[in-house]
Swiss-Prot record:
<feature type="transmembrane region" description="Helical">
    <location>
        <begin position="97"/>
        <end position="117"/>
    </location>
</feature>
<comment type="function">
    <text>Part of the ABC transporter DppBCDF involved in dipeptide transport. Responsible for the translocation of the substrate across the membrane.</text>
</comment>
<dbReference type="GO" id="GO:0005886">
    <property type="term" value="C:plasma membrane"/>
</dbReference>
<keyword id="KW-0812">Transmembrane</keyword>
<keyword id="KW-1003">Cell membrane</keyword>
<comment type="similarity">
    <text>Belongs to the binding-protein-dependent transport system permease family. OppBC subfamily.</text>
</comment>
<dbReference type="Pfam" id="PF12911">
    <property type="entry name" value="OppC_N"/>
</dbReference>
<feature type="transmembrane region" description="Helical">
    <location>
        <begin position="132"/>
        <end position="152"/>
    </location>
</feature>
<keyword id="KW-0653">Protein transport</keyword>
<dbReference type="GO" id="GO:0015031">
    <property type="term" value="P:protein transport"/>
</dbReference>
<dbReference type="InterPro" id="IPR025966">
    <property type="entry name" value="OppC_N"/>
</dbReference>
<keyword id="KW-0813">Transport</keyword>
<keyword id="KW-0997">Cell inner membrane</keyword>
<dbReference type="Pfam" id="PF00528">
    <property type="entry name" value="BPD_transp_1"/>
</dbReference>
<dbReference type="GO" id="GO:0071916">
    <property type="term" value="F:dipeptide transmembrane transporter activity"/>
</dbReference>
<feature type="transmembrane region" description="Helical">
    <location>
        <begin position="156"/>
        <end position="178"/>
    </location>
</feature>
<feature type="transmembrane region" description="Helical">
    <location>
        <begin position="262"/>
        <end position="282"/>
    </location>
</feature>
Amino acid sequence: MSDTPLTFAPKTPLQEFWFYFKQNRGALIGLIFILIVALISILAPYIAPFDPTEQNRTALLLPPAWYEGGNPAYLLGTDDIGRDILSRIIYGTRISVFAGFIIVLLSCAFGTSLGLISGYYGGVLDTIIIRLIDIMLAIPNLLLTIVVVSILEPSLANATLAIAVVSIPSYVRLTRAAMMNEKNRDYVTSSKVAGAGILRLMFIVILPNCLAPLIVQMTMGISNAILELATLGFLGIGAKPPTPELGTMLSEARGFMQAANWLVTIPGLVILSLVLAFNLMGDGLRDALDPKLKQ
């Protein structure tokens, strides 16, 4: 009987990624939570028990159903004008997550393009772009966001745009560093010899090799965007009432922290959970995508 050596098929990149990602329990919990939130956000019109702006003047400041005096029809209670908190939380989460994705897509698209151009060409153009980025980074994010929103006029759309603009520098610096590291490698030189144009070199040849840090930054960027959007809503320069946005809900509940603490506690816990989930998933993505950490 001859001994035949065992052979194992090499893992595909996706299998290898999942192998390292699932080692991080926190990242798995974050991913599951985010998937549940995404599903709830998509199905919000069908699972929310009430319209988030509907007022019931006979059910003002009802506590959650498990409190004394609570009503099972209003599982998380009602606010000072009789709106269902659960419905507003569902729609508020939907707005926050959707806005977070829009912010990250906009900032990543512009930031990555600028970073690729800056890193590829270098010289005076690189110096100008980096000096502008340094100026933006020298100003605290929240302060710069407030300035941009004030210029544009406070609203949910303008708050989203302002946060996207302020988030651009991190993507520029990441992409520029990756471009400068990659542009002189052999595969890029081979593509040049084969006749690849500048746009093809930047966006098709080099960019895919710069994606790992960008994916991690995008995940962390969503959590930052959700937190900043809630902050602007709380300050009164984000979403306007009666829009069921989490920060706006906190702002409206400030006067009831003693009499109806659930109006502050529930939206606050939702914001905390969303930010924590995206951060945990970002940590897992970093561990799975960074070759140094794998070693």
